[in-house]
């Protein structure tokens, strides 16, 4: 098994999408998320969480995003014992994302606990440049 760096969107993949009458502190994890992420982390994978929370309402101002939502998000991850190595705020808000290394998330049951059925990156990274 090759250890992978796995970058995972927060809302709609790890946490339920926030409803109009909720705050981000109120949302629940998606079924299977905690268990599967724990299994992936235990298998040695490097987990990166990426979120676009407040990017639209803050007009892309990442400093303002941090002030408004970072502590709430970090507390939520701790509350639900979500394992991760990095978290990145500032995913640009968009209607659709096109990426050559994307995996279309449907449900956590479709992902092996050790990550073996996740696609392998076909990009080769060159240092420098």
Model-derived regions: residue spans:
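Catalytic phosphate/metal-binding cores of nucleic-acid and nucleotide-processing enzymes, i.e., regions
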Residues: 1-129
